[in-house]
Amino acid sequence: SPAFDDEHNDNFLRL
């Protein structure tokens, strides 16, 4: 999954 993905961002923290 991409780093910045609105629907599925598992690489970055969801703030």
Curated annotation (Swiss-Prot):
Modified sites of kind Leucine amide: 15
Q: Where in the cell is it found?
A: Secreted
Recorded GO CC terms: extracellular region
Q: Could you name the domain of life of the organism this protein comes from?
A: Eukaryota
Q: Which segments cross the bilayer?
A: none
The UniProt keywords, alphabetically, are: Amidation, Neuropeptide, Secreted
Gene Ontology BP, a term: neuropeptide signaling pathway
Question: What task does this protein carry out?
Answer: FMRFamides and FMRFamide-like peptides are neuropeptides.
Family recorded in the similarity comment: Belongs to the FARP (FMRF amide related peptide) family.
Protein name stated in the entry: Extended FMRFamide-12
**Organism field:** Lobatophasma redelinghuysense (Gladiator)
